[in-house]
Structures are given as structure tokens and as C-alpha cells.
């Protein structure tokens, strides 16, 4: 199926690895011109080279920390014509509530929420003029099922849903859509590294870890396995396409059924 993304300019924040990289790769595979982002130039260069090698597609890069307003301004000056904005950049860290200082709440909000808000604010005027655009926030199942071990993270993921829905309301009646995507447990590089550490200390295989994880930690999962980054990316690519023109203001789950709700 042709998603109609040929030559559309897409920016994916936090896209040198994991879900973000998979999204950038999927969009490039559909013919979009993709701008990859990471904190360091070597990471960005490596991601660009991998996308070009895999997809035979052109890709560009922007290195910088998008939790900073100054970096968002630099990005906009370098790439002012973005038509598809995917706000994937974010941070997480398990920490007990009593140990989360005020500065940490602010840091998480800056990184996970304001980074996307700033970019949407910068790119929205041109999208309005063109009467076409896509803004997608990569949230999490943690937006709905707040994890007790990282309440500050869950708060930011819920805030993304509010921003996404409110912005969709603000552009009602235009050719711009705004949606959020809620991945569930996903087999990212971080998961791989964690399992490798377990294998060294507990002689536990990935399969054994996965089985135990979904029995004890995410028993409501319907697929009983980690999703792949590519499975999340497929949903994002569709939402970014002209084919998804009737989908806006939605919180779309790619959580493997972890959230135990029909709505």
C-alpha cells in the first residue's frame, strides 16, 4: 500500500535508536524526506547511514538536546518546512515519589512535554498556511496506567495526551491532524541491554525474562510479548499519511492490549 508520503518532509525527535529510529526508517521507506535527531552528531550520523543503507532513501540530521528552547529555535532555522512532526524525544527514570525533587519534575516536563509543545508552536503556522500537516506525540501506556515507580514520567505522558487533544481541537476544520500514540512494552535497545545484564547475573534468557515479565509485571497484555519498534512505527507512518485524514484528536494504542479498557 502506498501511504502517499513521497517527498513529504518529516522530523522525528529522538530518532537515533529504538522507536524513534524505527519511525524515521518507516517514513523514509515510504518516500518521505526524513530529518533524524539525537543529542550527539556521531549518533545522528550513524542513524542516517543506517537508514540510507537499509532503505536506499535520503535522510538528513540535526544534533541537539530538544529539552532546550534554544535548540528548538536552531532546528526551526535549519529545517523550517517540516510537514510531519513526530515528537518522540523523551526521558524516563524509575524513582520513588519521595525522592523526586522539584528540579526533576521540571526536567521531565521540559524534556517530555515542552520539547513537543515548542516544536508544534514553531511549525504550526506553516502547516496552517498549507492547510496540511501532521503532528504526532509519542506518549505511552503509562499515560493511562501511571507507574508507581515513576510518577513524574507518567505525569508527562498524560500531559502529552492533553496537549495533543487540545491542539487537535485548535486546528479543527483544517487539513492538519494531531494525534498521540501509546506504545506498550516494546523491545527497545534499553530492554535488550537490561536482559543482557540479567543473563550475566541470573543466567536468564530473553525468552524466560519475557515470559516472567508478562506473567508478573504486565499480566493484562493480550499479546504476551514485547512489541517491536517496527510495529509502533507502522502505526505512526499511517497516522502521518494522507490516508489517516479522518483520524485526529485520538490517543491510539499500540500497547498489545495492556490497558484493560474498551475505550
Language-model segments: residues:
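Conserved glycine-rich cofactor-binding loop
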Residues: 9, 16-17, 40
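Short C-terminal tail/terminal secondary-structure segment
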Residues: 145, 236-237, 243, 248-263
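Short, small/polar-rich loop/turn modules that mediate ligand/substrate recognition or access, typified
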Residues: 172, 177, 247-249
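Substrate-binding pocket helix/loop in short-chain dehydrogenase/reductase
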Residues: 96-97, 104-109, 135, 217
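Residue(s) in the substrate-gating loop at a strand-loop-helix junction
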Residues: 140
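Active-site helix of classical SDR
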Residues: 120, 156, 164
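Alpha-helical segment proximal to the catalytic Tyr-Lys
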Residues: 125, 169-170, 245
Amino acid at each position: 500500500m502506498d501511504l502517499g508520503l513521497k517527498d513529504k518532509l518529516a522530523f522525528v525527535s529522538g530518532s537515533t535508536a529504538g522507536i524513534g529510529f524505527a519511525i524515521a526508517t518507516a517514513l523514509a521507506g515510504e518516500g518521505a524526506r526524513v530529518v533524524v535527531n539525537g543529542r550527539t552528531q556521531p549518533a545522528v550520523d550513524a542513524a542516517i547511514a543506517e537508514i540510507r543503507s537499509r532503505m536506499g532513501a535520503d535522510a538528513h540530521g540535526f544534533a541537539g538536546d530538544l529539552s532546550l528552547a534554544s535548540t528548538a529555535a536552531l532546528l526551526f532555522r535549519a529545517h523550517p518546512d517540516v510537514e510531519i512532526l513526530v515528537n518522540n524525544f523523551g526521558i524516563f527514570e524509575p524513582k520513588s515519589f519521595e525522592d523526586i525533587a522539584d528540579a526533576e519534575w521540571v526536567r521531565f516536563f521540559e524534556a517530555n512535554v515542552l520539547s513537543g509543545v515548542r516544536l508544534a508552536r514553531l511549525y504550526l503556522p506553516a502547516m496552517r498556511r498549507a492547510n496540511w500537516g501532521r503532528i504526532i506525540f509519542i506518549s505511552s501506556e503509562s499515560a493511562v496506567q501511571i507507574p508507581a515507580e515513576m510518577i513524574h514520567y507518567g505525569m508527562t505522558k498524560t500531559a502529552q495526551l492533553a496537549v495533543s487533544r487540545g491542539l487537535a481541537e485548535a486546528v479543527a476544520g483544517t487539513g492538519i491532524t494531531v494525534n498521540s500514540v501509546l506504545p506498550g512494552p516494546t523491545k527497545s535497545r534499553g530492554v535488550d541491554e537490561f536482559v543482557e545484564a540479567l543473563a550475566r547475573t541470573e543466567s536468564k534468557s530473553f525468552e524466560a525474562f519475557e515470559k516472567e515479565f508478562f506473567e508478573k509485571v504486565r499480566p493484562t497484555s493480550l499479546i504476551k510479548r514485547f512489541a517491536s519498534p517496527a510495529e509502533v512505527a507502522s502505526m505512526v507512518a499511517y497516522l502521518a499519511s494522507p490516508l489517516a485524514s479522518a483520524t485526529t484528536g485520538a490517543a491510539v494504542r499500540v500497547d498489545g492490549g495492556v490497558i484493560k479498557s474498551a475505550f
